[in-house]
């Protein structure tokens, strides 16, 4: 069990680890008891010390910034939190530490714009499930996300469960090279639950946007959503010079009165407002009203550039026009949408409007949170649909031979292609989906002035990928290798705001065996409290 709230004593969760640990000691909880950040033995090749000037030397640098460009072999200079130079053979003097990146790919960290991290202990539980029992009668199983995760599991979470789930899920993604997350956890049953989530996000040591959403299925007497947003913002998120930001959750499926209140609170605080927008929840007419500026109980809520919409499946032309014209952001979770019956991921619709999405993981109770899967799924889905559109235009086989030796004369030889229509979207490329997973993620979270590319002046959120491993070598094309071949085993080093968090394949300052025990204890409690039997070979 996580030590955050031992003996059922809720603790005040401060905006820094130092204050948090002091508070723990003051309540009789020794900081050593946490054992989350145990010292590691010295390595033969140690990472740069925090704040030390260093250069990443000799890697294949993919900056994702057209003005900076790409380099087959180049260096990245980091001073403090920021990138100060990118280019070949940088002259950095003798005081800079050197990270040897030969045989490696150096690129920006991935950015996940929608992740329900509180569900980490429920990984794989819903691998065969769909979103909701929609009454279709199709054989999709009775174990659905809405009925099980939100209505059975979510209500029994304690603050200590929130903490360890958020912490472990965040560290797992950090290990995978995801340096920024928008945490969308509908687990805010009480202010203590919210504080536990925020503290875990801080303790993960990566950049995050804290999404303040409702508490799913709760009847807690201390339920304070959405009013507690004001306290949370004032306590944790007023500084712009930190790794953390806040986003206001404003789910329109909660009803006109509640979402109007949450949207108005968010806009008063100057926050982005995020919501799941998808047809299985009957949201199409609500989005149509918002597109007309007639949303909410008073019919005065409209769309804006401060909106971040998740999924956007099954929406009308009017809804899409409103989102486009407002300059709102869209996050697509391709693998989840394809598997859980959210509807067709709207990548072709976005292309037709000149829009691009960011990428997101959604839920690990069904699918993996690694970003290589997100990028591949995006590219594969768009291409299978587009390729079939192209094939459907083909005319009957033409007798012209392919020119291949021994080609049987009775086998169709070639399709005759008409001129393709002007509005046919372009096939996505590996570079496109890399942009979706980095630059577009930063834009979606209003962080593009800080991160998303290897641009001098931006903060150093950098990943170093090993291209010498057996699944990649020989390296022939950098974007293709990252998207088409790599997985988390290739993520060798991860840097957040200049600080090395993963080094030579290992997370730093983390006692994973201890955290794993805490996560498993939380899992056991959650299943028991929800009245759901644990069965390793059944999907219920």
What are these regions (language model features)?
Residues 24, 29, 33-40, 44-54, ...:
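Histidine-rich, glycine-flanked metal-binding segment
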Residues 121-162, 281-306, 326-329, 373, ...:
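Active-site gating loops and adjacent loop-to-helix segments of metal-dependent hydrolytic enzymes
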Residues 45, 187-320:
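Metal-coordinating catalytic core of metallo-dependent amide/deamination hydrolases
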Residues 125-184, 189-206, 227-239, 520-522:
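Alpha-helical scaffold segments that flank or form the walls of functional sites
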Residues 1-19:
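N-terminal secretory signal peptides
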Residues 300-301, 348-469, 485:
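His/Asp/Glu-enriched, well-ordered alpha-helical/loop segment
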